[in-house]
Regions:
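Conserved class I S-adenosyl-L-methionine
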Residues: 1-37, 51, 55
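Mobile, glycine- and charge-enriched loop segments
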Residues: 31-43, 140-142
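Class I SAM-dependent methyltransferase SAM/SAH-binding core
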Residues: 43-45, 49-97
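A short acidic, Gly/Pro-enriched loop at the edge of an enzyme's catalytic core
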Residues: 99-108
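A short SAM/SAH-binding and catalytic strip from SAM-dependent methyltransferases
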Residues: 107-121
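A short glycine-rich, Lys/Arg-flanked "PGG" loop and its adjoining helix->strand segment in the class I
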Residues: 124-136
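SAM-dependent methyltransferase
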Residues: 141-202
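C-terminal lobe and adjacent flexible extensions of AdoMet/dcAdoMet transferase-like proteins
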Residues: 202-247
Length: 247
């Protein structure tokens, strides 16, 4: 189902990065966690239209490969690469069936990727494929919906999103509908919110160590733009969280 959802979104996915939660929360938090990529190779899993792939290349990564299951997303990423060449490579691929890549990468990143696994076994399979694609000691960074997010807290609409439970429960956790309030047409995506222990157990079983959760933050630019009070509800109940570990 996730393939169809993202194929239908296509280039509109780029608009997500302009919404306050993403622009001033997700992007600076995630890039800050990953840190210095100069001279390193990066594997971007569920790369979408290539936003982070391009950003890592601009920041000095030597080799960046973006992989996504959506044909349409990869088509858009390649189109952008043609218009603004950065020497980023993209390929269509399912992380749960990731092919041997012919080399190992220094850094792996997965933004809203592992939460599309339909079961704990599928999530562990994703993690094993990622682990074998990284150099020993390589770092893996995850950005995902917060496992224990309270859906009954203040609305996220002023930050550009709605996050609602669908009422369904999967093997790994509740299912949720996230709506990006884009103009002129909002876009909704349904995925699972795996429990914290599911992530941790699957990563460790796949050979990862030093598993650590990292909280979402708001950038100084976001505070200057909107003021501290604007972000109070978001920081009291952040809908997103990050995770880092080592291969």
């Amino acid at each position: 189902m996730s393939v169809q959802q993202y194929d239908e979104i296509g280039e509109a996915f780029e608009g997500f990065k302009s919404l306050p939660l993403v622009r001033y929360g997700e992007v600076p938090s995630f890039l800050g966690m990953v840190g210095d990529v100069r001279g390193k190779s990066v594997l971007d899993l569920a790369c979408g239209t290539g936003f982070y792939s391009r950003e890592f290349k601009r920041r000095g990564a030597t080799d960046v490969l973006g992989v996504d299951i959506s044909v349409e997303m990869i088509a858009v990423a390649r189109e952008i690469e043609q218009r603004e060449p950065l020497d980023v490579r993209y390929e269509i691929g399912d992380v749960s069936e990731l092919r041997p890549l012919g080399r190992r990468y220094d850094i792996g990143v997965a933004v809203q990727c592992l939460n599309y696994a339909e079961s704990a076994a599928a999530l562990e399979r994703m993690c094993r494929n990622i682990h074998r694609s990284l150099v020993p000691g390589g770092e893996f960074f995850v950005f995902c919906q917060k496992p224990d997010y309270r859906f009954d807290c203040a609305s996220l609409d002023k930050y550009g999103f709605l996050c609602e439970p669908t009422g369904e429960e999967s093997e790994t956790g509740p299912r949720a509908r996230v709506t990006a309030l884009l103009d002129p047409k909002p876009i909704s995506i349904v995925s699972t919110v795996p429990r914290r222990e599911v992530y941790e157990e699957c990563l460790r079983a796949s050979g990862f160590s030093e598993v650590r959760w990292v909280p979402l933050q708001v950038s100084e630019a976001g505070i200057r733009e909107f003021g501290e009070d604007f972000w109070t509800d978001l920081l009291a109940h952040p809908p997103l969280e990050m995770l880092r570990c080592r291969a």
